[in-house]
Regions:
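Conserved, well-structured ligand/cofactor-binding cores
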Residues: 1-265
């Protein structure tokens, strides 16, 4: 067992755990759904943390050896390691604070190990001062949601397009099959089964356009806004650098919102 402290006092943490005291507080405080975080979201949040560490190293604020250890830890989470170290309930107070700190603690403790120190050596790698540097739950968490949504949209759009293609084939195949159209639970006027299939395809195509439009908007992020959008505690160059680094990490173009206060609130 190791002992960790927060403003509420001291708690014992099992040696094998990569999360720490703030995650344990969340487990005690928020018994809401009994479910766990989506694994794609965990990976997306790790991508955000990786991009942030890279940007903070670029500005010179984050020590390079610490930053590289955080990046390695984030890469391991992205690869699917430590999946059992994110036990917090998806629904919790603080609009994602517990999730954010769960990630920060896992990355900090793994980074400590990478640097040759035991878990809980927060004087070496701090969940707050290093893993959450130039960040707030209010920018890191919503950005991770956007990254996750973009990633998940790809198989969804592929599946919907395949469905449209098949419905259009059926529209042609059934073009001469006549049936009654119905209104108010009664027979109304004739329509072909092919016309119905074509209408289904049209509706799904419209849905695809809406999803693509939403995905396009998700590429605008508020990283660097910190708590309320003013960028307090973030280096000026970081705000530009973190969008670039996230683009490189995810493989999608991300852009900083024109007004960070608006984007955050």
């Amino acid at each position: 067992m190791r002992k960790e402290h927060d403003f509420l006092g001291e708690l014992e943490v099992a040696d094998e755990l990569y999360y720490g005291v703030q995650t344990i507080r969340a487990l005690e405080n928020f018994h809401i759904t009994g479910k766990h975080l989506d694994q794609d979201f965990i990976k997306a949040l790790a991508m955000v943390k990786k991009a942030s560490a890279l940007a903070n190293m670029k500005t010179g604020r984050l020590n390079v050896s610490i930053g590289k250890a955080i990046v390695q830890a984030a890469d391991e989470v992205i690869e699917g390691q430590f999946a059992d170290q994110f036990p917090v309930d998806p629904i919790q107070g603080g609009a994602g604070t517990s999730v954010n700190m769960n990630m920060n603690e896992v990355l900090a403790n793994r980074a400590c190990e990478i640097l040759g120190h035991p878990k809980g050596s927060y004087d070496i790698v701090s969940p707050n001062n290093h893993c959450n540097m130039a960040q707030s739950t209010n920018d890191a968490f919503p950005t991770a949601i956007k990254v996750c949504a973009i990633i998940k949209s790809k198989p969804l759009l592929d599946a919907l397009q395949r469905l449209v293609d098949e419905l259009e084939k059926k529209a042609e195949e059934y073009s001469e099959i006549l049936k009654m159209g119905r209104t108010h639970l009664q027979d109304a006027v004739p329509i072909t089964l092919g016309q119905e299939m074509g209408a289904y395809a049209s509706g799904i195509r419209r849905g695809i356009k809406r999803i693509k439009s939403a995905v396009e908007g998700a590429h605008v992020i508020n990283m660097g806004a910190t708590a309320v959008g003013t960028g307090l505690n973030a280096e000026p160059n970081y705000i530009h650098d973190v969008a670039y680094e996230l683009s490189e990490v995810v493989g999608e173009p991300f852009y900083t919102a024109e007004n960070l206060i608006d984007a955050t609130n």
